[in-house]
Amino acid sequence: MSFILMMLIILAACAVLLTVAPLRKRLLTAPILKGFRAALPSMSETERAALEAGTVWWEADLFRGRPDWRGLTAIARPQLTAEEQSFLDHEVEEACRMVNEWQVNFKDYDMPKAAWDFIKQKGFLGMIIPKAYGGKQFSAYAHSQVVAKLSTRSSPLAISVMVPNSLGPAELLLHYGTEEQKNYFLPRLARGEEIPAFALTSPWAGSDAAAIPDFGIVCKGLWQGKETLGMRVTWNKRYITLAPVCTLLGLAFRLYDPDGLLGSTKDLGITCALVPHNHPGVDIGRRHIPMNTYFMNGPTQGDQVFMPLEFIIGGPKMAGQGWRMLMECLSAGRAISLPSANAGLAQLAARVAGGYARIRNQFKTPISRFEGIEELLARIAGYTYLNDAVRTLSAASIDLGQRPSVVSAIAKYHVTERARQVLADSMDIVGGKGICLGPSNILGLAYQQMPIGITVEGANVLTRNLILFGQGAIRCHPYLLKEMQAAQHPDRGQGLNDFDHAFWGHVRYTIANGARAIWHGLTASAFAGPGSQGPVEMRQAMRDLNRSAAAFGFLADITMLMLGGSLKRKERLSARLGDILAHLFLASCVLKRYEMEGRIREDADLAHWCL
């Protein structure tokens, strides 16, 4: 009896401790907050900007273990407007007819002048620019469709159109430019009078773009015959697409103000500027040769080039805001450009390999009937279906107003990796026809070019090991970012209040996720159903995905609890957790594609294979 009484007293004391806020904060939350601050890894402003950039979307539901199938199924199938469809049927087809990949890469080392003139005059370089400035103002889905189609014909053509419509001068001007900058540059970009390039990567800071050594010093100098407050900028950039032919160079560098001409801050931070190609001291024109693919790509340099502060995108007030600008704009471009281009390459490979396997006979039998080839064809078909599902849903998220940084990283990594596998399998099927380069070899050049997409916009090895879970955990978790912000709050009292609210919400969330994961595991997902949402034939897959999401949410929390700040250095573990989150998203894309395309019976096997 005394034991029961003692237990009741302990439970009552715990209840009082947890429910009486002042007592809980002083005896529990404050010591936990102290330990949390000690375990929290140091974070630079550039890291913080990268983590806080963009938005979270469906991937957050998956991370939290409670996918909102009603919300996902409510997303309408992306549709092209009449203008967009006409552009795809006419201008895009004509552009494809004008470019011969073999001629570009082995004879002329450039696209024909007629093709350059055509894509400029027909608005290919201004698809993201609003009509008010003379652009096309296409949807993200239309943009994706155009890039995917061009990629099936010519990589130099697709890249030359893709880059001006991705992260670069137009995108940055739209969001941060002054009215004067917008009114002058955007119409010229839309008409193709300006060819843009954006110089970020340096020889010594590739994927770690925040560490760029290029710098500018605020000073006074002569500009148009008058002494002007400006900056002397020194840069050495490489791998810049369109740099050899650009007329408007976007430039990222770290700006310093040692003499305090703009205020007391000496290190203003990364800054973005627009520099005309003929500005004194700008060096462009030399070219790289990326995997024998002759799109325009090359270095650019400048040594103490003086330019007025008005060259800064957004004017002098945006000095030092460049990293935030880049991170906030990166999500949209990364969700469209490389996923679309590589989905297009996979479509090309699937068509070539599938057709070849039907007509190529070995031992008086079409090779498509050999089990070894069937296995490759199945993987080609499945990955191509999956890639297009990811491409479409990623573009749809942009059209819904999202800027999903984690989704864009997932799409870039997994679409490019699967396109690489599709091309490898296709080359195995066509054999010698793919090895010997020539005008009739459709796959050889595409296979040779694959490392380009794997490497650019965040190398895949970096993306998988550091970004997918590292960024996803903080952005998608309902409480972790709030806890971090509370721990760093300058007002200690307010920080304690905020942390108390976030931490105990986190505890309830973890317990609920763990209980749900165990329950769904014990019942084999029988009660994890999505209700009446989704196709009947896919309900079991949706139940399994609900179960997996709950288990992942619980596992992610336990991992972060056990490792704390050291998780940042556990790259292989982070990569595996990122794989789980990414595959949950990929499965969702497949289910959404199958549902929104009308639940085509012939596609059910493809969808099940992907799942």
Which residues make up each language-model segment?
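Terminal amphipathic helices with adjacent charged low-complexity linkers/tails
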Residues: 359-375, 595-602
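Amphipathic, small/basic residue-rich leader segments at the start of a protein or domain
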Residues: 11-164, 171, 176-195, 207, ...
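C-terminal amphipathic alpha-helical interaction region
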Residues: 505-611
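A short core secondary-structure module
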Residues: 226-282
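Glycine-rich phosphate/cofactor-binding loops in nucleotide/flavin-utilizing enzymes
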Residues: 434-534
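C-terminal helix-coil-helix/basic helical segment that borders enzyme active sites and/or dimer interfaces
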Residues: 385-414, 427-430, 434-435, 564, ...
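Flexible, small-/acidic-enriched active-site or ligand-binding loops
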Residues: 280-306
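A glycine-rich, basic-preceded beta-loop-alpha segment at the flavin cofactor/substrate interface
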Residues: 299-334, 351-368, 515-536, 548-568
